[in-house]
Design a protein with these regions (language model features):
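A structural signal for well-ordered alpha-helical segments within the folded catalytic domains
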Residues: 17-20, 76, 80, 185-193
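Short, polar loop motifs at secondary-structure junctions
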Residues: 42-48, 104-106, 208-211
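Catalytic core and acceptor-binding pocket of nucleotide-sugar-dependent glycosyltransferases
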Residues: 148-233
Length: 256
């Protein structure tokens, strides 16, 4: 069974620096097996930096697009996943934002999938969404009370099967964004709205293995997502560098 870790990086060279830290932790701590590849969706400009970096290896495949030059388009680039010409070779997919570090073996993560749904970290509530991070104000609006479960999720870590249901969901989200531009927090509100609408979300299982924080992490969970908003990189990158060096100094502790 071939598995894919999917990462996108566009627009800002500092996100290539984050990518470097993420990929290094995948190698050192994630212990990804030989059947797991890393697909990096990026530009020709960043392709040069990646291919000449210390972390570049035969595990990495590059998917190139030179049309994304804004924060908004860079965030939405992940919706192109199923346009990758070799995507059908992979059975399971783990999408990761670049502002992530891995501090434990993550091979087991792929085995958590039980249904053809997106598995994501639970965050927020569509009925209490004053900043509209999850589409509560712009997309759900009067539909909120249609949902007994009003919990939302963070789209920075998403795990799913390579299946018709998810491929179709990505298509639906793309079309929704073209027709309705009311949501301002990039594509995350559209992920939340449509995944809930079509009952294609599990936002509980990954909570045991993913930590979302905007401070120095204090957890032994496998995946650390340093939050802070799209395009806001300075604090995130600083935390990632400091914590990565901490991990290197405490390798035996972190890998337990």
């Amino acid at each position: 069974m071939k598995k894919l870790i999917f990462i996108t990086v566009f627009n800002n060279i500092n996100y290539v620096r984050m990518l470097s830290l993420l990929v290094k932790t995948l190698y050192i701590y994630g212990n990804i097996d030989e059947d797991t590849h890393i697909l990096i969706y990026t530009s020709t400009q960043f392709k040069y930096f990646i291919e000449n970096s210390q972390f570049y290896s035969k595990k990495i495949h590059l998917f190139i697009n030179d049309n994304y030059n804004t924060i908004d388009s860079a965030c939405k680039a992940r919706l192109d996943l199923f346009d990758y010409e070799l995507i059908d070779e992979y059975e399971k997919i783990l999408y990761l934002d670049t502002d992530i570090l891995v501090q434990k073996n993550i091979n087991f993560i792929f085995d958590l999938i039980e249904e053809n749904k997106i598995y994501a970290f639970g965050e927020g509530d569509i009925s209490n969404d004053k900043d509209d991070f999850f589409g509560g104000k712009s997309l759900f609006i009067n539909e909120i009370n249609n949902y007994k479960d009003k919990s939302a999720f963070n789209s920075g870590v998403m795990l799913f099967n390579n299946c018709f249901e998810i491929k179709n969901l990505f298509k639906i989200i793309k079309n929704h964004m073209l027709k309705n531009k009311s949501a301002k927090f990039n594509d995350q509100p559209y992920f939340v709205y449509n995944a809930k609408k079509y009952n294609l979300i599990n936002n509980t299982i990954l909570n045991n293995y993913v930590e979302l924080t905007n401070q120095m992490p204090k957890t032994n969970k496998a995946i650390l997502h340093i939050s802070g908003g799209p395009g806001i990189y300075k604090n995130k990158l600083n935390i990632m560098i400091i914590y990565f060096n901490h991990m290197l100094k405490n390798t035996t502790i972190m890998k337990k």
